[in-house]
């Protein structure tokens, strides 16, 4: 997980275009058979992508979150901008097809992503923020 620190508003107004891109642009987010995550100290948001092609991908907390599992103290929204896919949340299977979305509530432990067809893989765009209350997981069609 890449970690980005907050920038001072006084400093940002003097950044060049190249410096703005260096500090704020997220590149190469969608990579085959990987989950890529970028943690920003601005609002403690995590932006990411999961692109399962040949294998099922499991979402893990990593050392940066200092949590037992990714959504221990967070919630997550996702949208599938690729081919049809499957998201499994704590054993419950959701068929998340192209342009479908999901809200996954705080406390969800085991989350995996997979594609139905490797020749047209699912591409899950993810956003996660801190959560103080658990709400139920919802599939948005």
PLM segments and residue spans:
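Surface-exposed beta-loop interaction hotspot
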Residues: 113-141
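Short amphipathic beta-strand/extended segments with alternating polar/hydrophobic composition
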Residues: 58-61, 95-99, 139-140
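Short acidic-glycine-tyrosine-enriched beta hairpin
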Residues: 90-106
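Glycine- and acidic-residue-biased ligand/ion/polar-headgroup-sensing regions
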Residues: 40-56, 65-91
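Short, charged beta-turn/beta-strand-edge "cap" motif at the junction between a beta-strand
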Residues: 108-111
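Intrinsically disordered, low-complexity, positively charged segments
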Residues: 4-63
